[in-house]
């Protein structure tokens, strides 16, 4: 019997983690130069991407309000900080996506994703390397 109670407690804790994630805000470069740093609500973030392939070190947070915010942290550092966050998942070498903001998807050689508040899809957002985990999280 104790195992069953422990299993139930684990399921309850998992559900609570989903409803109330451990990290709610993330530090980004502020729009207002008077501020040293501002904190972005992660619930508003559609995806996080890097332009490392273009020789730029900055990481961009795209929000449902079509606003971009930047961080000097590498995508891998952000991924490490968000690894316990149930809403975020790495879907390619260049993207971490907020699973709660996805409103559509196109299956092709790579998967394109549409997000709440954004008109255009993010092309090749889910690559084959990360597809199994992506599909698992949507089941």
Predicted feature locations:
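Conserved binding/recognition cores within well-folded domains
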Residues: 4-117
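Charge-dense polyanion-binding interfaces
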Residues: 114-133
């Amino acid at each position: 019997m104790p195992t069953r109670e422990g299993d139930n407690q684990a399921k309850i804790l998992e559900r609570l983690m989903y409803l109330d994630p451990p990290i709610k805000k993330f530090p980004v470069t502020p729009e207002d130069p008077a501020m040293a740093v501002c904190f972005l609500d992660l619930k508003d973030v559609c995806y996080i991407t890097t332009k490392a392939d273009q020789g730029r070190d900055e990481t961009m947070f795209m929000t449902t309000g079509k606003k971009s915010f930047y961080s000097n942290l590498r995508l891998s550092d952000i991924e490490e900080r968000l690894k316990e966050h149930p809403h975020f998942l790495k879907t390619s070498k260049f993207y971490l996506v907020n699973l709660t903001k996805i409103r559509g998807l196109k299956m092709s050689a790579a998967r394109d994703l549409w997000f709440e508040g954004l008109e255009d899809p993010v092309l090749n957002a889910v690559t084959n390397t990360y597809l199994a985990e992506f599909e698992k999280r949507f089941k």
